């Protein structure tokens, strides 16, 4: 790629302003990157410059980073981002592209790829596939959690930090290396009276109104007909072998590998090895042909 410095991006989709970062030449292999819960596009700041030959566009999902928050009556269900993702790739002129997602972004990537398989050439999932399914009889309990959380979080003020270092320390408490925490925090903060506060929408911390059932999860996995690479963190979801086993049961063209590191392994010291594995997969070295 031409350099490590990203190019800021902005789009207007469905009345929402969406922000992002891009790396590489526009003529490169198109690769859309979706970050995890409470992260932002800077999640790919270390990985993207190492993906040789790719044009990487990392999106701040709604309510994260520099993208707009949704209106008070709206929600942050995992499928709510799909129309905006479709709008962004259409604005980019990408009829076919590859998709990489981390954590919540991996889950959203699975949903998008299963819904629009004709658009996704190859799929890369970093330490997540789909959310844990719930039994149908749990629907009333889940809906109650959603309604009460929404009422509570609409009235909640974001935490204020006196300094950038204070915000970085707060993210470090969640197990992130300091250098990675700083990258994410710098894009997730704005100035306010008394210092700095998050740009992330507090409602992202609330319960989902509806969760997928076992059969719905299975239908999503079966619809992932493109070559798919699942990289699991040894200190993350790699400790739950049933996640990969379930994916292997239903995704036909799946490659699963375990990666040394924690849940944010793509932001840790082994990022070069991760980039090498993803580059090889995008170049078709997994033996699976694209449809």
Where are the regions that the model predicts?
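Alpha/beta-hydrolase fold catalytic core
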Residues: 1-31, 52-54, 94-95, 130, ...
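Active-site loop/oxyanion-hole signature of alpha/beta-hydrolase fold enzymes
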Residues: 11-16, 57-100, 116, 276
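Conserved HGGG/HGGXW glycine-rich cap/lid loop of the alpha/beta-hydrolase fold
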Residues: 21-69
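Gly/Ala-rich beta-loop-alpha elbow adjacent to hydrolase catalytic centers
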Residues: 101, 105, 109
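Flexible "cap/lid" loop of the alpha/beta hydrolase fold
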Residues: 114, 121-160
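Conserved alpha/beta-hydrolase catalytic His-Asp/Glu region
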Residues: 156-211
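Conserved serine/cysteine hydrolase catalytic core
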Residues: 192-249
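Catalytic histidine-centered segment of alpha/beta-hydrolase-like enzymes
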Residues: 262-271
């Amino acid at each position: 790629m031409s350099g490590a410095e990203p190019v800021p991006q902005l789009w207007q989709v469905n009345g929402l302003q969406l922000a992002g970062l891009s790396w590489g030449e526009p003529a490169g292999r198109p690769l859309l990157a979706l970050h995890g819960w409470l992260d932002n596009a800077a999640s790919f700041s270390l990985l993207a410059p190492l993906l040789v030959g790719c044009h990487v566009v990392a999106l701040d999902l709604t309510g994260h980073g520099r993208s707009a928050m949704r209106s008070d009556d709206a929600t942050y269900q995992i499928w709510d981002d799909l129309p905006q993702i479709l709008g962004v790739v259409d604005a980019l002129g990408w009829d076919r592209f590859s998709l990489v997602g981390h954590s919540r972004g991996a889950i959203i990537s699975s949903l998008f790829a299963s819904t629009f398989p004709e658009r996704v050439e190859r799929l890369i999932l970093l330490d997540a596939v789909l959310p844990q399914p719930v039994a149908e009889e749990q629907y009333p309990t889940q809906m109650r959690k959603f309604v009460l959380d929404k009422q509570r979080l609409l009235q909640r003020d974001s935490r204020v930090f006196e300094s950038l270092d204070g915000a970085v320390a707060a993210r470090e408490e969640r197990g992130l290396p300091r250098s990675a925490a700083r990258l994410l925090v710098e894009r997730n903060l704005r100035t306010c009276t008394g210092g700095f506060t998050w740009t992330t929408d507090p409602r992202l911390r609330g319960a989902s109104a509806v969760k997928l059932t076992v059969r719905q999860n299975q239908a999503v996995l079966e619809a992932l007909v493109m070559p798919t690479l699942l990289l699991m963190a040894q200190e993350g979801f790699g400790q739950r072998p049933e996640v990969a086993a379930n994916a292997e049961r239903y995704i036909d063209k799946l490659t699963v590998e375990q990666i040394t590191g924690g849940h944010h392994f793509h932001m840790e010291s082994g990022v070069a090895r991760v980039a090498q594995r993803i580059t090889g997969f995008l170049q078709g070295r997994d033996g699976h042909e694209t449809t």
